[in-house]
């Protein structure tokens, strides 16, 4: 939904539009602060009508939907003419994401323009100079100093940068080279200097700048091989309205500021914006905290210190690179451990020397292709710390800390071939990063009270257990009443007291089902008791934990917060 603050951000009030799920742009009429335009991109996971452009003229008390195409098309970008607040250009984007596939583009995508505050709209097509056929995501930028100059970064059969010199009535393709950007579904952001209509920034993995109105670009910020303190993968950009040398960059590593047009950058280090997938601790005293961060590696730091001034940034150490996920410190010697990254990579590290090496399982034969989830499964055997488990579509077991592996299960997923076409994913522009890998194992949970007892959950809704270290497996999916077929099973927590007892979390939001799901079994999955539903919490479930001393005290992590 959308929130409003009347005290400079100290407090916020919900003003509606909750069902839009995702809002991409908000524009306030500079002549009337009660008139606001909202560009709702909607949920990528499902079709729903609460998307498009909404308008309020009473400060958010009521809303009118003024532009709608269809229930799978939302607003990718929206700009207002700074000299005429009734003139707005909107990029509509048809897209759909499934757990196993992504499609950008379709007949719903297009560019629209209004001159009367949204009462009437004109769709701009190939007649105005835009590309023919289906379009994908479109990024827009208007030159505030000369608002007749408008740029459109268009995903199409051939991605290109288009320019209008008459306020959007006609368009010309000016650049279709690789320097305009990559991965349009993920980026497609373009910005123009308010003081120089020919200085254009394309913001993507790199940041490129044009000084000739987009005809050519040079690299302003390389992604790799430089030490400027700026993380690659850029998603937000701000240019000072009267000083084009002053810019702010928002990227996958945080926020950076330049005062000299991008020659030097200062990292803003006091914003807590890191995204941790998992958190773990070791057995030291004081203990250390470990975690893997989205696109920012895996880290280790003290929970507390016996020093004045507390924990400093310098006390934290990066122990592995990439998209960080689970970190498993060695219970016997926390100098060593395992850190995961995307595509199922796992490394054994030595944080004292900084050395590490890959211990990722390899296929059991030449004909088998392993499928690893973006956030793959790892488990440490609580009875034998030499033993490690790792998940692809199989359970892999190592008894020598990852040096060698054996497969100890059949394919525990549905192995649905229709959900294994990631090489075709992306829509108009192919995009196969591994984020849509499917029919994979999500969780491997060894029991801390029963040797050789393993629980396994998958991303296509299957739950198995083995009581003999993987020699045989029993599926209990059908016993979980109310579990939607094909749901994700991101967590199973085996009881620390009782054999055969476990907690299970499932979610199905990737298919536009935001219902919370959690169950408990006390008899090895023969029956399950549902312990949370929509009447208890506000959003889908992600994790669950039982207090080790008081079994009646439980914690539930949801997309909405902690319960």
PLM features per residue range, with description:
Residues 1-563:
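Beta-propeller blade termini and top-face loops
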């Amino acid at each position: 939904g959308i929130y409003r603050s009347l005290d400079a951000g100290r407090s916020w009030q919900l003003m509606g539009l909750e069902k839009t799920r995702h809002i991409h742009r908000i524009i306030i009429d500079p002549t009337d602060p009660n008139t606001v335009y909202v560009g709702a991109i909607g949920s990528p996971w499902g079709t729903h009508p609460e998307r498009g452009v909404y308008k309020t003229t009473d400060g958010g008390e009521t809303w009118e939907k003024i532009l709608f195409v269809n229930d799978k098309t939302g607003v990718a970008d929206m700009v207002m003419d700074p000299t005429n607040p009734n003139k707005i250009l909107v990029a509509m984007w048809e897209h759909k994401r499934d757990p196993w596939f992504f499609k950008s583009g379709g007949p719903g995508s297009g560019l629209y323009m209004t001159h009367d505050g949204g009462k009437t709209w004109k769709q701009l097509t190939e007649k105005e100079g835009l590309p023919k056929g289906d379009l994908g995501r479109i990024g827009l930028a208007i030159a505030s100093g000369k608002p007749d100059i408008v740029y459109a970064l268009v995903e199409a059969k051939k991605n290109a940068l288009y320019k209008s010199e008459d306020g959007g009535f006609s368009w010309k393709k000016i650049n279709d080279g690789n320097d305009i950007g990559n991965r349009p579904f993920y980026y497609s952001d373009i910005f123009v200097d308010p003081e120089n209509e020919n200085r254009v920034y394309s913001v993507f993995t790199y940041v490129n700048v044009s000084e000739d109105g987009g005809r050519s670009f040079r690299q302003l910020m390389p992604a790799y091989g430089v030490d400027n303190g700026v993380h690659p993968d850029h998603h937000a950009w701000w240019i000072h309205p009267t000083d084009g040398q002053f810019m702010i960059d928002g990227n996958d590593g945080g926020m950076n500021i330049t005062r000299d047009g991008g020659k030097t950058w200062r990292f803003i280090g006091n914003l807590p914006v890191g995204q941790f997938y998992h958190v773990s601790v070791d057995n030291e005293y004081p203990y250390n905290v470990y975690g893997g961060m989205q696109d920012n590696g895996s880290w280790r730091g003290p929970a507390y210190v016996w020093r004045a001034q507390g924990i400093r940034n310098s006390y934290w150490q990066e122990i592995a690179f990439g998209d960080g996920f689970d970190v498993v410190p060695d219970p016997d010697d926390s100098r060593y451990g395992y850190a995961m990254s995307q595509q199922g990579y796992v490394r054994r590290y030595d944080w004292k020397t900084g050395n590490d090496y890959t211990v990722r399982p390899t296929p059991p034969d030449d004909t088998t292709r392993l499928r690893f989830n973006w956030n793959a499964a790892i488990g440490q055997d609580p009875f034998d710390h030499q033993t490690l488990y790792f998940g692809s579509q199989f359970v892999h077991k190592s008894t020598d800390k990852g040096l060698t592996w054996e497969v100890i299960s059949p394919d525990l997923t549905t192995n649905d071939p229709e959900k294994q076409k990631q090489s075709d994913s992306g829509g108009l522009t192919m995009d196969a990063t591994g984020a849509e890998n499917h029919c994979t194992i999500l969780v491997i949970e060894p029991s801390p009270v029963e040797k050789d007892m393993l629980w396994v959950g998958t991303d296509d809704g299957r739950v198995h257990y083995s009581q003999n270290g993987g020699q045989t497996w029993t599926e209990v999916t059908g016993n979980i009443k109310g579990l939607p077929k094909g749901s994700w099973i991101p967590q199973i927590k085996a009881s620390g007291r009782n054999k055969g007892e476990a907690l299970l979390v499932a979610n199905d939001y990737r298919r536009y089902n935001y219902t919370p799901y959690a169950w408990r079994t006390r008899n090895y999955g023969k029956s399950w008791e549902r312990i949370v539903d929509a009447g208890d919490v506000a959003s889908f479930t992600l994790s669950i934990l039982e207090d080790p001393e008081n079994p009646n005290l439980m914690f539930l992590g949801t997309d909405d917060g902690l319960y």
